[in-house]
Amino acid sequence: AGEARASLYQALDKARAGEMAESEQCMIEADTQLKKAHDVQTELITRDLNGSLPMSLLLVHAQDQLMTTMSEQSLIEHMIGLIRDIGMNGGK
């Protein structure tokens, strides 16, 4: 989730700089990275349900990071949309 988070904030920085195509590419990268992290999470949850995965602080932290990054993805998508709207309407 850490790589996805970095890509999300890079996308926001690119959008703020008016580099919308680059911003979109960063968002695509972040989405790909988040899907991979989510797949790993699903695997771990399945193992936990089967009783074959001991609980650890590291796993709790990883879960928290993934959930936070997914929330940030949604917010950053909306922020980039606002930046795009403002740019298209000349700030009006």
Task: Show which residues each predicted segment covers.
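Terminal alpha-helical segments
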Residues: 2-92
